[in-house]
């Protein structure tokens, strides 16, 4: 699966790392401590240094992306899977990376974001997409 989808792997990996590029460009404007985690109530409850926030979170997501791709490609039953479902494996983490890092940078620049309102809706949309492509 990975050999015939090399371009997808490269493009999805670049998309996951795009927030790090934004962080490098905006490095001097970012505060030294950045909110990287919010509780279920939408309040910030986790802070990280600028280096981890800019580089660590995209790298962790990239590693997780590679692990998901590896396990999916090693699955003997993946040939029987719907190709759209397999394609979702390539694009879930890039979308999550852009969204979560976008929220993180938005908070770093002092912009409000009502996470408690949007997260249930976004999780619902994600489950709808996943539910439509899982085998029955």
Positions of the model-derived regions?
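Feature 926 captures the class I aminoacyl-tRNA synthetase adenylation module centered on the KMSKS loop
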Residues: 2-34, 39-136
